[in-house]
């Protein structure tokens, strides 16, 4: 699967990313979701540092904590669009990235 790299995100891409982040941040408040404990007051997993968010990758749903800055990478934006197409964002499964875990690790190694 080839992912095209662009130097700048268009304003429509930025708007889409903001919408995705907004949807993800409005997940229901629950005590324990997918083995992750949430603080009922601020709706954030207690083990996720500020400026990061969890994603679940592959058929085994391996959990990764990724920095918000990755939202600016066109490759990561492509994965988010694939996630929206395959799963939508109105479910209790957390943000699930529909790709092979080996591919995801390879991709994120370029971001570091």
Swiss-Prot record:
What does the induction field say?
Induced by auxin (e.g. 2,4D). Up-regulated by brassinosteroids (e.g. brassinolide). Highly induced by a synergistic combination of auxin (e.g. IAA) and brassinolide. Accumulates in response to reduced red:far-red (R:FR) light, during shade; this light response can be attenuated by AGL8/FUL in the stem. Repressed by AGL8/FUL in stems and inflorescence branches. Accumulates in reduced red/far-red light ration (R:FR) conditions mimicking shaded conditions.
Tissue specificity of this protein:
Confined to the veins and petioles of rosette leaves and cauline leaves, and specifically expressed at the abaxial side of inflorescence branche; relocates to both the adaxial (Ad) and abaxial (Ab) sides of the branch in reduced red:far-red (R:FR) light, during shade. Also present in flowers.
Instruction: Tell me the superkingdom of the source.
Output: Eukaryota
Key word Electron transport present: no
Q: Which UniProt keywords apply?
A: Cell membrane, Developmental protein, Growth regulation, Membrane
Report the subcellular localization. Cell membrane
> In the record, which residues are listed under signal peptide?
none
**Coiled-coil blocks:** none
Q: Which GO terms describe its biological process?
A: developmental growth involved in morphogenesis; regulation of unidimensional cell growth; response to auxin; response to brassinosteroid; response to low fluence red light stimulus; response to red or far red light; shade avoidance
Q: What is its main location?
A: membrane
Return the GO cellular component terms, semicolon-separated.
plasma membrane
Membrane topology recorded in Swiss-Prot or TrEMBL: Peripheral membrane protein
Q: Which family does it belong to?
A: Belongs to the ARG7 family.
The protein's job, in short, is: Provide a mechanistic link between auxin and plasma membrane H(+)-ATPases (PM H(+)-ATPases, e.g. AHA1 and AHA2), and triggers PM H(+)-ATPases activity by promoting phosphorylation of their C-terminal autoinhibitory domain as a result of PP2C-D subfamily of type 2C phosphatases inhibition, thus leading to the acidification of the apoplast and the facilitation of solutes and water uptake to drive cell expansion. Triggers plant growth probably by promoting cell elongation. Regulates branch angles and bending.
- Protein name (database record): Protein SMALL AUXIN UP-REGULATED RNA 10
Organism source for this protein? Answer: Arabidopsis thaliana
Report the gene name. SAUR10
């Amino acid at each position: 699967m080839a992912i095209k790299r662009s130097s700048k995100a268009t304003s429509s891409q930025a708007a889409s990313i903001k919408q995705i982040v907004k949807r993800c941040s409005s997940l229901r408040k629950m005590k324990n979701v997918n083995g992750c404990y949430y603080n009922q007051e601020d709706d954030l997993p207690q083990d996720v540092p500020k400026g990061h968010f969890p994603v679940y990758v592959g058929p085994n749903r391996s959990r990764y904590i990724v920095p918000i800055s990755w939202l600016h990478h066109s490759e990561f934006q492509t994965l988010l669009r694939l996630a929206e197409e395959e799963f939508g964002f109105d479910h209790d499964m957390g943000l699930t990235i529909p790709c092979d875990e080996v591919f995801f690790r390879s991709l994120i190694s370029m971001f570091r």
